[in-house]
Structure formats: structure tokens, C-alpha cells
Amino acid sequence: MNLNATILGQAIAFVLFVWFCMKYVWPPIMAAIEKRQGEIADGLASAERAKKDLDLAQANATDQLKTAKAEAQVIIEQANKRKAQIMDEAKAEAEQERNKIVAQAQAEIEAERKRAREELRKQVAMLAIAGAEKIIERSVDEAANSDIVDKLVAEL
């Protein structure tokens, strides 16, 4: 094979071309590729962090919902207990009021009964005196009459 100056020139030109590419062309290309790889890695890491944050937020939301439900249940139970307490107090108060009204009514009935008995005794005494006056057919003075009425009332 015949090595002549052309092949030697081409070899030198090729070596210079490779050196030029390695020195001036290759570094910006590699820098752009590395920059892009870094951006992609950052994007993936950010997506992974966002996914973890979402999972954490969902877990927190679930925990808060459970806590809120438990608190709501406690509040409902307290409200039911308070309702029962109020109902019991109202029943007791109504029972006391009923007993008071019944006692008052019984006292009024007893007072009315005594008054009616007293009135009846007086009327019976008056009728007895009137009957006695008619039977005896004489007049009795007023002082003696009231004394007789009082004695009859006491006896009845």
C-alpha cells in the first residue's frame, strides 16, 4: 500500500478535527445533556416528593376525618345525655307541680267540705230551732237563740 502525503494530510486533518471537536464541540453538548439529565432527575424527584406529600395529605385528611367523626359522636352522646337529663328534670318538675296542684286541690276540697258542713250544721240548727219554735209556739229571745245554735253546732 502506498502511503503518500495525501493520506498523511488527511490523517492529520482528521486528528485535528477530532481534537477540535473534543475541545470545543463536545463539552457544550455534554453540558447540555448533563443539564437535561439533571432537570429530568429533579422533575422525577419532585414528582416523587409530590406523590409522598399527596399520600401524607390524604393520610392526614383521613385521620382528621376520623377525629372529627369521633368528636361528633362524643358531642352527639353528650347532647343525648343532656337531653335525657333535661327530660328527667322536666318530668320531676312536672311531677312536683302535679303533686302541688293535687295537694292544693285537696286542701281546697277539704276547706270547701268543712265550710259546707259548717253551713249545713247552721242550717240544720236553724231548722231545728224553727221547728222547736213552731212546736213550742213561743218566742225565745235572741241571746238564748244564738246560745242554742252554738250548742247544736258543737254537737253536730
Swiss-Prot record:
Transmembrane helix recorded as keyword: yes
Question: Is Transport set as a keyword in this record?
Answer: yes
Q: What is this protein called?
A: ATP synthase subunit b
Q: Which organism is it from?
A: Serratia proteamaculans (strain 568)
Pfam families from the entry?
Answer: ATP-synt_B (PF00430)
UniProt lists the gene as atpF
Superkingdom of source: Bacteria
Q: How does the UniProt record describe the way this protein sits in the membrane?
A: Single-pass membrane protein
One MF term from GO for this chain?
proton-transporting ATP synthase activity, rotational mechanism
